[in-house]
Amino acid sequence: MTVRYYKDDMGKVGFVFVPTSMKKQIVPEFDCRLEPLIQCKLVGDAYPGPFACGHTMRDSGTVKRISFTGQEEIRADGGRRIETSFAVDELSFVHKLTFFEGYDAAECCVSVENKGGVTVSLEMLHSFSLGMLTPFENGIHKENLNLYRMPSRWASEAHLEKKLAEELLLVPSFLEEEIFCVSHGQIGSKPTDHYIPFVGIEDIEKKCCGAHRYHVQAPGKLSLFVRITGFQSAVVWRITITAHG
């Protein structure tokens, strides 16, 4: 597995995951907006634009002001961890991505610390936010993404559900900057209820598949999110996956 970090002209930092055997197929210049590593919302924050209310709290006013402060790699516990730091006002965020020897998966979490004397109410904090899920070509490739989910009412008993992104309405809109989000995950106090906290993404043409799940002893959800970047040149889009408990 290969991970690449990117920083745009606005100082936002994001990353891309691909199989190591496919890293040379990543397009050098993305035609989509960089997905920030940190997604959070404070009480009183502005919502992220048209029709976002009720769909998502991501891309809040605080996220737009967060700045990158540093990155380091730490080798410990039989693996290595990449810590990327950010700050806004008196809040400090650390995005931790950990690789363990012998595993073809990585663990991701985000921590936040209030270093000021003013109380801040954190309404939402994503454990991870991963965009650019198919970084192998530019533009829109219709009916090329299969999304896998696992409906369940108890424990690990579930069936596998497969749908195209278009079937879940994760498609571009004719309204510039419109936001659309599909969420699922754990609700209530049962081990699982409604959906196992898992999602798989398959690039049909490239025969590449990745899966994501969260581990938290509380209700939480995974969100699939799409937002176009504008009509100035071509309409371009990517699906983003986020999780929080």
Regions found by a protein language model. Name each.
Residues 245:
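Carbohydrate-binding surfaces of carbohydrate-active enzymes
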Residues 1-242:
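Polysaccharide-binding surfaces and accessory modules of carbohydrate-active proteins
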